[in-house]
Amino acid sequence: MIISSGNDYRAAAQRRLPPFLFHYIDGGAYAEYTLKRNVQDLSEIALRQRVLNDMSALSLETKLFNETLSMPVALAPVGLTGMYARRGEVQAAMAADKKGIPFTLSTVSVCPIEEVAPAINRPMWFQLYVLRDRGFMRNALERAKAAGCSTLVFTVDMPVPGARYRDAHSGMSGPNAAMRRYMQSVFHPHWSWNVGLMGRPHDLGNISKYLGKPTGLEDYIGWLGSNFDPSISWKDLEWIREFWDGPMVIKGILDPEDAKDAVRFGADGIVVSNHGGRQLDGVMSSARALPAIADAVKGDLAILADSGIRNGLDVVRMLALGADTVLLGRAFVYALAAAGGQGVSNLLDLIDKEMRVAMTLTGAKSISDINADCLVQAIKQGL
């Protein structure tokens, strides 16, 4: 198969993965309206073409939290990444490191902090949920700090798990789920050998380290389900802010008032995100939410954005709408599932190329030049 775009990686991943894994990463909440709008709204944003501007000296380099990034992209935290390729978190982190961008390790990764951090040269980021088990949270923070993680990404849009109906149909959950997953794996021998067998252990490494025993997929569902905390408030984050002395980013902001609260709290950054359409269906796409949030807090903290970003054009669009940097989630997991770490490297190079074309034809010589002036006026006013 010829790979020429991010969509090609999605198609390749669908062929290679057992359905329960493909649909877990590909699906969203409820009827998946927000999942679709994330992609569609971004694709409908018209860039303003400018020509004859001598674009020979063009740079994608940017700075964020005292780190230099080769382009304004980081890999987002994605749970179970190690189920999509053999020791998938390590492979993805190495690809990000090679490209000169941050990798964010999920709380519910297969590979633990202690396995991923030594595999790369630059400090990785670590993502954490607010959970009832505060002992686990403190343990994870201590281990992240000891491993040299530079930035904490705190996910706040999961006080309860989203209703992901596709998971019940695919075998990730629902009746006879374990048997259905086993039967699917039989018909995907490449994955079964390369990941299912050679990629062991399939523990949720960060949780296993804390509990002192292996945890499999069923444990993941049960332990997390009992630990989500709907009582969380900004006050619950205060001890974390005091404990963590590095940059702290609040992930899951969709409203300008919440963004202002993050500034008052003392966050270093926010991620404008609807969790990739996986939590509450019917909320605004990140692209639609971003401009008002940028108007409210631009300059007070770093603004990151995710959800719906599939290519370099989408990165430029998000930056023009007010983001400083974007996070890639599904896009890199598709590439990882299709072709391992090399697939992620190829995807990042493709995004780099797509960004350069878009910047050249919008007259933006640097990342700081990408702003609302790069958008068609009607789009700026009526997104």
UniProtKB/Swiss-Prot annotation:
Start and end residues of each FMN hydroxy acid dehydrogenase domain: 1-380
Pfam families attached to this UniProt entry: FMN_dh
EC number, UniProt record: 1.1.-.-
Cellular location(s): Cell inner membrane
UniProt binding sites for substrate: 24, 129, 164, 278
GO CC, alphabetical: plasma membrane
Residues the entry annotates as binding FMN: 106, 127, 155, 251, 306-330
Record key words, sorted: Cell inner membrane, Cell membrane, Flavoprotein, FMN, Membrane, Oxidoreductase
Cofactors that this protein relies on: FMN
Keyword Oxidoreductase (UniProt): yes
Topological relation to the membrane, as annotated: Peripheral membrane protein
Active-site residues from the entry: 275 (proton acceptor)
Gene Ontology biological-process entries: aerobic respiration; lactate metabolic process
Signal peptide segment: none
Database matches in PANTHER family: L-LACTATE DEHYDROGENASE, S -2-HYDROXY-ACID OXIDASE-RELATED
Function per UniProt: Catalyzes the conversion of L-lactate to pyruvate. Is coupled to the respiratory chain.
Name this polypeptide is given: L-lactate dehydrogenase
Source species: Acinetobacter baumannii (strain ATCC 17978 / DSM 105126 / CIP 53.77 / LMG 1025 / NCDC KC755 / 5377)
